[in-house]
Regions:
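Surface-exposed extracellular loop regions of Gram-negative outer-membrane beta-barrel proteins
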Residues: 18-42
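Extracytoplasmic beta-rich repeat domains
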Residues: 1-8
Length: 200
């Protein structure tokens, strides 16, 4: 459609369909008797892979690659105080530099209080052929975590987050228990000095 690139995914937000393509997204509304329709386009909003968007309680979560030099993680949501046709692709990743990753097999997912994106790391400007990095954002605090998880797809099963391994035909349960299963843990967290609310 109109040089928007290949169709990738479709999601419903307040009885309106949003059709994501590679370079553009369309807002499709139809009447109840199916005699009339509108198809409004949103320039510069697009996804590179069918799994690069997902339905979330607040809207549609997606990795926007319409501007390849400025990739952003966004949430398409209804603007507060407006009708259900007025949406905004709000960036949730302004403090992240996402230009050093590839998104050919990007996965977006919402699990509990986490908005998750899995992407390909670039080494010497060459992208891995598989997802090798996970970004997880806590929606309550807004804090991002970068994890070395190799994930090709995500799904929730009885509350647990199940990940398809991007290097093998295996499934993993993520964020469960305290056992590292013999893996080397390369993730770390650095924070500022804090007295944790005490005067001492």
């Amino acid at each position: 459609q109109d040089n928007g690139g290949n169709f990738m995914a479709i999601f419903n937000l307040n009885v309106i369909e949003y059709c994501f393509h590679l370079l553009k997204t369309w807002q499709l509304t139809t009447t109840l008797d199916d005699t009339n329709a509108t198809n409004l386009d949103y320039r510069n909003v697009g996804i590179s892979y069918p799994r690069a968007a997902c339905q979330a309680p607040e809207g549609i979560l997606f990795a926007d690659l319409a501007r390849p030099t400025e990739p952003k993680f966004r949430r398409l949501q209804v603007l507060e105080g407006t009708d259900n046709t007025t949406v905004e692709p709000k960036s949730i990743s302004d403090f992240l530099d996402l230009s050093s990753y590839a998104y050919d097999k990007c996965v977006a997912y919402r699990w509990g209080d986490y908005e998750i994106f899995c992407v390909q790391e670039k080494i010497n400007e060459v992208a891995n052929s598989y997802n090798s990095v996970m970004f997880a954002r806590n929606v309550l605090s807004g804090a991002w975590s970068k994890l070395d998880y190799y994930v090709s797809c995500l799904e929730t099963y009885y509350g647990s987050l199940i990940a398809g391994d991007s290097l093998s035909n295996n499934l993993n349960v993520l964020f469960s228990g305290y056992d590292d299963d013999g893996d080397v843990i390369s993730n770390h967290y650095i924070s500022e000095d804090s007295n944790l609310g005490t005067d001492n």
